[in-house]
Design a protein with these regions (language model features):
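Short helix/strand-capping connector loops at secondary-structure junctions
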Residues: 135-154
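C-terminal or internal capping secondary-structure element at the end of a domain, subdomain, or sheet
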Residues: 150-178
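Short, low-complexity, charged/polar segments at coil/turn and helix-coil boundaries
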Residues: 2-5, 24-137, 173-178
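Small-xxx-small helix-packing motif
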Residues: 11-19
């Protein structure tokens, strides 16, 4: 089963060929299948979120420490907004409306509030090409610094663990039916 990530950077799902058709048929056959698959897929997605958090810990701080600075890199602050969602396929969502906490210039002093979604793409893919993106690390194209790196590194784990989870759920349901 070859899996591939689909979606945008802040909202990604992992799917394989024919997976959606299989999930539809299996979900219609037994309602308990959907419940158990949601729990199993959330555990697989949580592994990727944990890897992204580890990758974000390794990111350098952006610029000099200033008075009132939290001492965290933007990646460390943004990765706290990533959540593994309970869906039938492993899904990760960014809480993009959540406020981005800045100790040096807090949101209460700003007219337009800064959100996690505003900072995520710069922290993940970089910037420095325009005057408005100088606070980010250098641009790395589609490579990514912490989140997509975790997705790529976990690709084989996701495929294996998710297919094992499908097998476990089907075996549990088969034992319960007899």
């Amino acid at each position: 089963m070859a899996s591939k990530p689909i979606g945008r950077a802040g909202d990604v799902q992992f799917a394989a060929d024919g997976l959606f058709e299989f999930l539809r048929i299996a979900g219609q056959a037994d309602a308990e299948f959907n419940k158990k698959m949601r729990i199993a897929a959330e555990q697989v997605a949580q592994h990727v979120v944990d890897r992204a958090k580890v990758n974000a810990q390794g990111q350098p701080k952006h610029g000099q420490n200033r008075p009132g600075s939290s001492g965290m890199s933007q990646a460390q602050a943004v990765v706290n907004g990533l959540r593994a969602r309970r869906d039938r396929i492993p899904t990760i969502k960014l809480d993009h409306k959540r406020g981005f906490v800045s100790a040096s210039l807090p949101n209460r002093k700003r007219k337009t509030k800064v959100t996690m979604g505003d900072v995520f793409f710069g922290a993940e893919f970089g910037g420095r090409r325009r005057p408005t993106t100088q606070q980010f690390l250098r641009h790395r194209g589609r490579q990514g610094y912490f989140f997509w790196q975790a997705v790529r590194d976990s690709n084989s784990f996701i495929a294996k663990e998710y297919s094992d989870a499908i097998d476990r759920v089907l075996k549990e349901l088969a034992q319960g039916a007899t």
